[in-house]
Amino acid sequence: MAMSSYMVNSKYVDPKFPPCEEYSQNSYIPEQSPGYYSPSQDTDFQHPGIYSRSNYSEQPYICSTVQGSSVQPRGHVQDQASTPSPFPAQTEQCPAVQISGSRTCGQQQNTKTQNGIPTKQPAVVYPWMKKVHVTTVNPDYTGPEPKRSRTAYTRQQVLELEKEFHFNRYLTRRRRIESAHTLSLSERQIKIWFQNRRMKWKKDHKLPNTKGRSASVGNQHAQHAQKDSQTEITTL
């Protein structure tokens, strides 16, 4: 209300300013100094506060007084010099406790690995995976013999095979199965042994080979046929 009465009594007139374009063209606005945006205040000027300030004097703090003050620190921190610890210091037993704890942890891990994870079993190696060149006769072996292997016969087995060869140089299927069971060999092993023994016997007795003998007989028949044809031509 006081402000409005002042405006009425003073007959205040609203000022009129030219447009901004005229200001920019006629350079009415002078260049302002950097200090224009931060106007300095007089040192003598003091703005009266709204509330009266109480007479409070600030006390400066000194580092020595702060360190030596009796203010207790916040939290669970306690002064070691003022309050002695109820438990005595045990420097020698601490490492022993840590070592025992680590050992128990290692034992627990080992038990977990043994109980939870099964141990790795060795890989199964089948007979066909082995590269065997010379094999000894195994009496408990009943399966087929691996290929490209040379069997080492025992003295007793060779003696029994020689007896069979002395009576008959060719074995029947039934006799071959019986001898294979008695000598703990396979039929293939006995068959190969008899083949080799027959070749050796022919070589010792200097008998001609059956293949060469048949070829020589064929050549003789051819020669006789040629001679007969020549004689017939001459007679004509």
Curated annotation (Swiss-Prot):
GO cellular component: nucleoplasm
Subcellular location per the Swiss-Prot or TrEMBL entry: Nucleus
Keywords assigned: Developmental protein, DNA-binding, Homeobox, Nucleus, Transcription, Transcription regulation
Positions occupied by motif Antp-type hexapeptide: 125-130
Primary role: Sequence-specific transcription factor which is part of a developmental regulatory system that provides cells with specific positional identities on the anterior-posterior axis.
Biological processes per GO annotation: angiogenesis; anterior/posterior pattern specification; definitive hemopoiesis; embryonic skeletal system morphogenesis; hemangioblast cell differentiation; positive regulation of transcription by RNA polymerase II; primitive hemopoiesis; vasculogenesis
Lineage, highest ranks first: Eukaryota, Metazoa, Chordata, Craniata, Vertebrata
Name of this protein: Homeobox protein Hox-D4a
Pfam families to which the protein is assigned, alphabetical: Homeodomain
Species of the source: Danio rerio
Domain of life, source organism: Eukaryota
Entries under SUPFAM superfamilies matching the protein: Homeodomain-like (SSF46689)
DNA-binding region residue numbers: 146-205
Any GO MF annotation of the entry: RNA polymerase II cis-regulatory region sequence-specific DNA binding
Signal peptide, first to last residue: none
Biased composition (Polar residues): 79-91, 211-223
Name of the gene encoding the protein in the UniProt record: hoxd4a
Region annotation (Disordered) ranges: 69-91, 204-236
Keyword Cytoplasm belongs to the record: no
Family: Belongs to the Antp homeobox family. Deformed subfamily.
